[in-house]
């Protein structure tokens, strides 16, 4: 029993060091359980304030009045005291609170928290959970693997020596074959076979062992409380037998989970554990029945390796795990799948039969080597045409190789090949898939270009057509499809040795233009036959070009006849209204009178005033100009036709100005000084002035107008152009006029008056400086033309006489040489 005096002394010492009467945060103290001394038991000096007479101390606990009855506060000493014995197993800790309160309940000091711990004493005896333990032990159990766990408890404080339990085997009955067949873990109470007991267990068939076991507290100390129990162990035969492989059909239609095998561990306290490699839908129940929980798919996993373990409650294996092989049996549940391939295959046209164009293959996920994965190929399309003896494609049913048949293919064709892949070796019940590939027949340059027309023309061209003119356009065609194979080249093969013609075309064009390169000549060649050939730029495959690769262009050269042209584009003259019938007004002539003969006619002589001579082109008044008024104009159209070629014609207008009849005779002005013009014609003329010397005429207002006299020869040979309001310009109309002296009549109009000038012009040959060269008279002593001719004729007669004598002599000499020898007379020698 512990005396209270030392505790009081201890608490007094603590209190001596307390200088402040303030509550501490929390006070902790320890009180031994089962205290056997006097009570009250002084536990702790509380830090109560001095002068606490004004209030009273209040003690409260966490269990209301029960704790208050167990503890109290000595008001005189200020100690916390225990009023009775404490039992740790009843309560190990008390939470107390001390306050100083006034009469009206007001807290003057506190609260002060105090925790009282009850110190444990070894006053509890260990107890087994059972007085007798029974267990079954299977042969083949590994040594050291617990097959039974003994359980015991101690009411003392956990974690202390008072509750630190140790297990021991006190005895084994029977002790055969070895007295230490078993081992017991002293800390855990795990009962297992000892290594020596494991080897001897097979000799103890159906034996029962009884063990006397003890549990003691205070750990390994010799002192302490203890308890005893009995363990009865039955030895049973080992039923942990190997398993045969299990074959399961894939996609098996049964109720799941479906049992496939069973294991059994004959020992007690067994827990079965299942492992699958790879993980699969398998489990095992508490009875050791193995199940598959769902349908299996051989293509996903064809085989599983299962391990079944028999374990104790702590997950330790009693024996080596059992292996179970699960083989998934194949079913024909997978159709062939076409292997990836290029969806389009290009094959050149003209490829020989037997050329492989594609190899279609399929894969079947069913078991390799089984009928379920035995694939046979069948050609679905294109189907051969009815009545056709040849096929475009051939198919190897085993390899899926597609080759060209004997039926020809054409460039540009797009053919969809459909091949059926059937498993079960092509059986009707087999699964199938359709493999497709598009065959594109590519073009080769096997067609030579050809002209659409091999004969063109005849094309008529005038010989004066200018170089560069288009002669003909030749169209060609090429049956090939590839643009590069349709590119053409053109050339002139024959018929143009002089290079008169040329070809032009665009690089990608299918037509060529035959153009003129040089001038044509009717005299040199009135016709041409030009042969043009067309060919491919790319190399031709197969037969060469045929006859249609050439085209012949026939060209006819047309002689050019110069168009009709009059010496003037229009004719104009002025006549008085009093001009009598039959008067010559003017003459219409061709520009080149010596080249052709014309026939003239009037087209629109509405008044019938005029007439024209058909051959000479002279225009006369057909009747009096009745109705004509001065100042009026009268226009007619003259048509000229070629006498030899009536189809050639031309026309010109004739404008007649009517003048007022002069009441007085026409005033003839004296000619001025002589003037000359050069022939052939040069670019200058004679200025004619219209200003009259008559003051009455000269003083009138208005411009002067000029016209040649009505003589046709004058109008043919001369041309008069106005120079200004008072002068005109006279030039030669013809390129050549016979040299001589000419009086050119010029009619002048001024206001209402008219008069005529006689302009004297000398036409002569001129030197390079434009100066007139005049004829000189015959010089004395010079021979005349007649004498010169006589001398020439006499000379020629003399030469002719001499030549006659020479030729006569030569003829006689040749005759003498031709006589035979016997005809020559003998000459006597003298």
From Swiss-Prot:
Glycan-carrying positions: 519, 604, 724
GO annotation (BP), single: calcium-dependent cell-cell adhesion via plasma membrane cell adhesion molecules
Modified residues (Phosphoserine): 823
Entry's localization field: Cell membrane
A molecular function GO annotation: calcium ion binding
Extracellular side: 22-788
Residue numbers spanned by region Ectodomain G: 668-788
InterPro entries: Cadherin, Cadherin-like_dom, Cadherin-like_sf
Cytoplasmic topological segments: 810-830
Xref: PROSITE patterns: CADHERIN_1, CADHERIN_2
Organ and tissue specificity: Kidney specific.
Comment field on protein domains: Three calcium ions are usually bound at the interface of each cadherin domain and rigidify the connections, imparting a strong curvature to the full-length ectodomain.
Name used for this protein in its record: Cadherin-16
Organism in which the protein naturally occurs: Mus musculus (Mouse)
Recorded name of the encoding gene: Cdh16
């Amino acid at each position: 029993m512990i005396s209270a005096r030392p505790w009081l002394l201890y608490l007094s010492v603590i209190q001596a060091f307390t200088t402040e009467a303030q509550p501490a945060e929390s006070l902790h103290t320890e009180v031994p359980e089962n205290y056997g001394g006097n009570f009250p038991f002084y536990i702790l000096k509380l830090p109560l304030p001095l002068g606490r007479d004004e209030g009273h101390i209040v003690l409260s606990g966490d269990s209301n009045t029960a704790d208050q009855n167990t503890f109290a506060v000595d008001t005189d000493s200020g100690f916390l005291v225990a009023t009775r014995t404490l039992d740790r197993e009843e309560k190990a800790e008390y939470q107390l609170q001390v306050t100083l309160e006034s009469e009206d309940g007001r807290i003057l000091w506190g609260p002060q928290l105090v925790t009282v711990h009850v110190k444990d004493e070894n006053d509890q005896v260990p107890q087994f959970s059972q007085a007798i333990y029974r267990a079954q032990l299977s042969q083949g159990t590994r040594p050291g693997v617990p097959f039974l766990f003994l359980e015991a408890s101690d009411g003392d404080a956990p974690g202390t020596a008072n509750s630190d339990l140790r297990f021991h085997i006190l005895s084994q009955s029977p002790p055969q074959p070895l007295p230490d067949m078993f081992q017991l873990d002293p800390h855990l109470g795990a009962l297992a076979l000892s290594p020596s007991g494991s080897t001897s267990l097979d000799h103890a068939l159906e034996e029962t062992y009884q063990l006397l076991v003890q549990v003691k507290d205070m750990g390994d100390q010799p002192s302490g409380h203890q308890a005893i129990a009995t363990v009865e162990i039955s030895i049973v035969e080992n039923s942990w037998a190997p398993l045969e492989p299990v074959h399961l059909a894939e996609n098996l239609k049964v109720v799941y989970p479906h049992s496939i095998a069973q294991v059994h561990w004959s020992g007690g306290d067994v827990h079965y554990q299942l492992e699958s490699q790879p993980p699969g839908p398998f489990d095992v129940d508490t009875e050791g029945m193995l199940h598959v929980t769902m349908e299996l798919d051989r293509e996903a996993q064809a085989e599983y390796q299962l391990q079944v373990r028999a374990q104790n409650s702590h997950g330790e294996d009693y024996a080596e795990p059992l292996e179970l092989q699960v083989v998934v049996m194949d079913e024909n549940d997978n159709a062939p799948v076409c292997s990836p391939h290029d969806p389009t295959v290009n094959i050149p046209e003209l490829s020989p039969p037997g050329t492989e164009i594609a190899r279609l293959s399929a894969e079947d996920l069913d078991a390799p080597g089984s009928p379920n994965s035995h694939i046979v190929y069948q050609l679905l399309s294109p189907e051969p045409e009815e009545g056709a003896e040849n096929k475009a494609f051939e198919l190897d049913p085993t390899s899926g190789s597609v080759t060209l048949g004997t039926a020809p293919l054409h460039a540009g064709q797009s053919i969809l090949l459909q091949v059926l892949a059937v498993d079960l070796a092509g059986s009707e019940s087999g699964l199938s898939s359709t493999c497709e590939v598009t065959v594109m027949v590519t073009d080769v340059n096997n067609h030579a270009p050809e002209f659409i027309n091999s004969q063109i023309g005849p094309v008529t061209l005038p010989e004066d057509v200018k170089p560069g003119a288009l002669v003909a356009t030749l169209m060609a065609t090429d049956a090939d499809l590839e643009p590069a194979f349709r590119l053409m080249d053109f050339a002139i093969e024959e018929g143009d040795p002089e290079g008169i013609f040329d070809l032009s075309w665009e690089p990608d064009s299918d037509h060529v233009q035959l153009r003129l390169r040089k001038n044509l000549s009717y005299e040199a060649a009135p016709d041409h036959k030009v042969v043009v050939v067309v060919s491919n730029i790319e190399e031709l495959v197969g037969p060469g070009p045929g006859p249609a690769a050439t085209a012949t262009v026939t060209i006819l050269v047309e002689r050019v006849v110069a168009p009709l042209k009059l010496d003037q584009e229009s004719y104009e003259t002025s006549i008085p209204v009093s001009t009598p019938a039959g008067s010559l007004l003017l003459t219409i002539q061709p520009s080149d009178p010596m080249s052709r003969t014309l026939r003239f006619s009037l087209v629109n002589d509405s008044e019938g005033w005029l007439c024209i001579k058909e051959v000479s082109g002279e225009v006369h008044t057909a009747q009096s100009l009745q109705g004509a008024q001065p100042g009026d104009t009268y226009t007619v159209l003259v048509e000229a036709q070629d006498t030899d070629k009536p189809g050639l014609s031309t026309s010109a207008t004739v404008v007649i100005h009517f003048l007022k009849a002069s009441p007085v005779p026409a005033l003839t002005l004296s000619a001025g000084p002589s003037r000359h013009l050069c022939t052939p014609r040069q670019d200058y003329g004679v200025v004619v002035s219209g200003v009259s010397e008559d003051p009455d005429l000269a003083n009138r207002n208005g411009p002067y107008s000029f016209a040649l006299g009505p003589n046709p020869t004058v109008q043919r040979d001369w041309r008069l152009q106005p120079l200004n309001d008072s002068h005109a310009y006279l030039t030669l109309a013809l390129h050549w006029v016979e040299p001589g002296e000419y009086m050119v009549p010029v009619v002048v109009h001024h206001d209402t008056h008219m008069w005529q000038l006689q302009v004297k012009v000398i036409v002569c040959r001129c030197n390079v400086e434009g100066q007139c060269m005049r004829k000189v008279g015959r010089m004395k002593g010079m021979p005349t033309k007649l004498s010169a001719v006589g001398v020439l004729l006499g000379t020629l007669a003399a030469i002719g006489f001499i030549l006659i004598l020479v030729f006569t002599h030569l003829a006689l000499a040749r005759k003498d040489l031709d006589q035979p020898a016997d005809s020559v007379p003998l000459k006597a020698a003298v």
